[in-house]
Structure formats: structure tokens, C-alpha cells
Amino acid sequence: MSVELKPASKYERKIFYKEEWNVKDVPDFIRNSLTSREFGFDHYGNGPNDRYKVFVDDLRLKRFIKVKQPFAAYCSVAFYDKPNQRKGWQKSELVFDVDAKDIPIRTCDCAEGEVCEKCLNQAKEIVLMIRDVLSGDFGLTNINLIYSGRGYHVRVLDEDVMDASSELRGDIIQYVTGSKLPDLSNEYGFNDLQPFIIPFGYPKNFTRWSKYTILHLRRSSKLDDVNNQLLRDVLKHRNLLQEDLWGMFRSNIGPIRYKKVMNAISRINMQITDTKVSIDLKRILRLPSTLHSKVSMKSTLIKNIETFDPFDDAVPKFVYERND
């Protein structure tokens, strides 16, 4: 049966937290650090106004959620000495937030603010690329992937990055998402050296992301400083990138126009993740295992991203029991 992504009623929330939710489904990386994290709750659908909560053990967290049956539950990516005051910051997870409704190059026909199976699959593709860069280029290993209900969170707990400043996190985002046009003339002494020629490091990553973005452009896509004719030419010749024929693609577009396109692509790439989330050391994120009440989906720790399907693995039982 198809799954309709509509809000959960108060009764459905009650059923979910009474019959289905289990505190043991909260990931270990959160349960093992409960006393260092701030928790926040949205009880009425107006945002997480109930903040500064701390739980000393699983039992107290379980009791609170079972009784309150919140519209949404969150916990901090930060670790504190005094989480109930958000004081004594120790470190923060490095996080990437990919929301399917905010992908700038969506290939679906969803209305603004809505999501569907197609754009959720696209969000999953993006998360896989982010994970590969984090593990391949940065050598990070403690990478946790979470389905948030309308997208994905990538939560990194390697100690090497958890004490990074907001500024450094911004630089990491630029690298990971290929959102800065490489300036190769200064580094290598050539004025016309193109990133697609260099098969390693950031130039390789930038080329990979640029290819992904260009192949997902549509006629309706809006690119800064790219007019309709140039966009049509990009769409006409982008099949060359399937075979990584960047030189021919650049030649067909023209060097000056090509540079305009690549500058625009880098700015689009910056919008693939929510940068504000990544650089905010005190951000709270949806608590995995809890309900995303706006779409009636479970936020879920993903064990195998390649086989994960939110419409099989993150749908609460009450959704299948609906009569309307």
C-alpha cells in the first residue's frame, strides 16, 4: 500500500509512544552520553519550547516520553558540563542535515515544503556521497546515518572533529559538498588548469559534485548568472559528463560561459545541506527513534543505508491502520 505523508493525530502519537516506541531504539551514541546532552521537546507543534531537559538514565527518559507523548523530541549535538544550563561546552558532533524538501535540484514535482519517495531517494544519494567523502578523504569512521522523517542527518563522532570551531566546520562543509570553485592557478602555477583534470583531493571531489548537480538540473532550474539559453546548452551537452568528457563539455559550452556555469554550480552545492545546522555548536536535532509528527514517520538510526527504505523501515504501525 502507498504511504501518505500526513500529520499524526494526538491519538496516533499516543498509540505510537504507548505501543511501539522503545527507549532501547535510541542510538547507543546518545544513550551513553545522556547526562552530557540537552534535550528539548515540542508538545503542541509550535517548536521545541520545552528546553534544557537532562535525563540521568534511560528509565527517566523513557518515563518522560511515555507520559508526555511529544509532538517532537530533540537532543543536542553538544556535550556540556551543565546541559540543563547549556554551560561548560565540551565538544559537538559534526553534523550534516539533508532535508528532502530543501534540496535545490529536486527532480520530483513536489509542492514546496512537501516530500515524496523520489526526492527522499535523492536525499539518500546525497547522504551516500557525503559519507564517502567523510570516510575516504577525511578518514573518519564514527559516522552515524539517521533518517529524520523528511530527510537524513549525518552525525560524526570522531574525536578529531568534535572540538572543531564553527569556522572550521564551515570549511569542512565547503570541501565535503564541493561548494567552492577550486583556485588551481595559484597552487600549480597554471592559469587554465581545470579541476576535472586532477584525479585526487578537493578538485576530484568538486568535479564529482558538479557532475551530480548538472545531471540533476531541469529546465525549470534557476542558476545565478545563467540565462535560459545557457541552461539549455548545459542540458543539451550534459550527456558528455556521463562519460566524464569534461573537456568536450567545456568546449561545447565555451570557456567563459563554462566558468559562469561552474560558479553557479558551486553556489547550488552549498545549499545541498543546511549550513546553519552544521556550524551551530549548540544545535538540537530530532531524537532518533521518535516520531516526526508532521509526516507520520519514525526518525530512525540506519543500520544499512544501501538497503534502507523509509517506506518500509520508518513507517509507524498506526499508519497502516488508518481508515481514511
From Swiss-Prot:
InterPro entries per UniProt: DNA_primase_S, DNA_primase_ssu_euk/arc, DNA_primase_ssu_PriS
Disulfide partners: none
Enzyme class at the top of the EC tree: transferase
Active site: D97, D99, D274
Origin: domain of life: Archaea
Record has Glycoprotein as a keyword: no
Cofactors: Mg(2+); Mn(2+)
Coiled-coil region(s): none
Record keywords: DNA replication, DNA-directed RNA polymerase, Magnesium, Manganese, Metal-binding, Nucleotidyltransferase, Primosome, Transcription, Transferase
GO cellular component: DNA-directed RNA polymerase complex; primosome complex
Gene3D superfamilies: DNA primase S, domain 2, DNA primase, PRIM domain
Record-level GO BP terms: DNA replication, synthesis of primer
CDD domains: AE_Prim_S (cd04860)
Family annotation (SUPFAM superfamilies): Prim-pol domain (SSF56747)
E.C. number(s) listed in UniProt: 2.7.7.-
Membership in a protein family: Belongs to the eukaryotic-type primase small subunit family.
Role played: Catalytic subunit of DNA primase, an RNA polymerase that catalyzes the synthesis of short RNA molecules used as primers for DNA polymerase during DNA replication. The small subunit contains the primase catalytic core and has DNA synthesis activity on its own. Binding to the large subunit stabilizes and modulates the activity, increasing the rate of DNA synthesis while decreasing the length of the DNA fragments, and conferring RNA synthesis capability. The DNA polymerase activity may enable DNA primase to also catalyze primer extension after primer synthesis. May also play a role in DNA repair.
Subunit composition and interactions: Heterodimer of a small subunit (PriS) and a large subunit (PriL).
Record protein name field: DNA primase small subunit PriS
